[in-house]
Structures are given as structure tokens and as C-alpha cells.
């Protein structure tokens, strides 16, 4: 039963913000975060972490009926045969504004880069805060304590001193994604801000 729920979460997570949201994204000539990651990495090297992270919604019989995935996609991959950690906001989910699981995964990216001493690649496109607040739906289970208790900027500062960090703004950014950009050297190219 638990295995089936994990598989169902994984399937729902891959739908990102839903078919309509992904379609609108494509109609504007834009790629989703998973598509961008696939374009950047060596073919078939992306090993996504935390696919099933997010907020499950259960019915009155405790059956999983919906799932809001973490809006940050994260994983290991290779660029020119070199192992990297790569991640970015999923703009198809509420414009990339962080949900609790997505925020945790975004901070975890820096921790993984430090742990494995490998480059960190960030592809930013998203807001810096959810303006709608948290859901009061009785079918949402509580998230619990954050997996990190330190300042979100602590792991960023550590990573910048230890591993190569490359950050690209691939659309509008605000809040924490924007702060990650300004923490690095910036180079403006054709209307995009890139940092390394």
C-alpha cells in the first residue's frame, strides 16, 4: 500500500503544475524546469532527488486523491562528464513561489554540493514567497519541522567558499532566488542575468 502511494506521488509530481499550466508555458515558447535541466545536462544523466516530496491531499477514507509536488526540482547530473548538483524552481506551479517542500529542497541543493564537493548549478525562475498563505484544507496533513534550522543564507555562503556555483536567471526572480543571484558575480547578456 505504501509503495503504491509513493508511485502515485511520483506520477502526480511529474505532472508539475498540471497539463494546462505546462501547455501555457510551452505556448509562450518556454521550457519547464525538467526540460531545461535535460537540455543542459549530458544525455540521460539526470538523477532526480525527492520526486515524491510535496503536500499530499487525502479524502475522508485516508486515500491519496491529489498531490502538490515540491516546486523545486533537484538532482545529480553531469555536464561535460563532470558530476554536478542541479536544481531550479518549477514556474508551472504558482509561478515558482516556494512551497514548504520546494524551499527545503532548494536549501538542500547547497548542502549536497558541499557534502560531495561538486559544482552547483541553479536555474532560477520564480517568486520569493507564496502570497496566498498556507492552505487550511482539513485534508492537508501538517508539514512538520523544517529539515534545516539555520539561516537559508548560511549554506549559500558556505557553498560559495567551497564549490563552484553557477546561477542563471531564466525569467522573473524575486526573494530567495534573487538573493542567490546577487550573492554572486553577475554578467548581463541579452537581457538575462547570469552569475558564476
Identify the function of each model-found stretch:
Residues 1-167, 172, 177, 183-195:
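Terminal-region recognition feature
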